[in-house]
Amino acid sequence: MTNPANKITDDLDDLLNVLPGSITSALRGVGRFDELIEIVMDLGRTPESRYASFADPSQAELILRREEVSLDDLAFVVGRIGDFDTDNRAGITRTLHRISGIKNRRGAVVGLTCRVGRAVYGTIGIIEDFIASGKSILLLGRPGIGKTTMLREAARVLADGKRVVIVDTSNEIGGDGDIPHPAVGRARRMQVSKPSMQHEVMIEAVENHNPQVIVIDEIGRALEAEAARTIAERGVQLIGTAHGQTLENLMSNPTLSDLIGGIESVTLSDEEARRRGTQKTVLERRAPPTFDVLIEIHARNRLIVHPSVADAVDAILRGRVPVTELRYVDAAGAVQVERT
């Protein structure tokens, strides 16, 4: 299995155009645009740029100028991006960039995080067999590791042959504005007026638009986990992300553990406890998992795959090591799979 060379679209000039000139000039002087993750501007502090610097962590954050960020600097950016949503996020029309605001208690913007959004074509080559399988897939990983990028590419690829609907709560998958970014291909996109309504839009997507696949970013609330289960029970393939980095994280999260079947305490009979060699009170999986497959993104092009969430959860609860696959792209661009 080979991983084709990735084509990247970042619309970076659109982001640079909303930044103060001195910051834009500093960024151009540094270069390293392929590694740029975000620009941070906090009132009274020097502006910084952050990079995905894997080889040298000391180069992951750079000060862009000695002059501290002023209210005029912040106003310059805010004036070019428009109003923030209720989650203090804004975007740039027809791009994947995200600008998040920090406000004081009076509602004035005192800080900005300008996140670079990229469409990276070819990122799902490493898991294309699972994506095409029709199984529901949950992606986990730390912020900035590439979950949303992979989600976006999955939507684009699947939309070539299936009815795909994206529930885009923060417009991070399909970009800002009413016309979705070309990176999602033929997938349809439903926007969400405020984050607390995400679960309702998930159900609306199923009831009104007859999708075969629903793509959802950042499942983080109990109502969203419940909506995901309802969708899966209707036979719709789900591809989503959730807060957490590993399967064990999710199992210990009372809000989201329902995604992997839920965990409950049960009392065994004396005979069953002897047969298992355990105490009478044990933890067990409560129900079938909402997601069939769970993928932990540990680094770009390096993943841990749990091919069967049900089997993995049961194994962990009984003190066994679950069956997993380590997948990575080697120096020659080939996808390697190591089963444990």
Language model features with spans:
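N-terminal accessory targeting/assembly segments
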Residues: 1-95
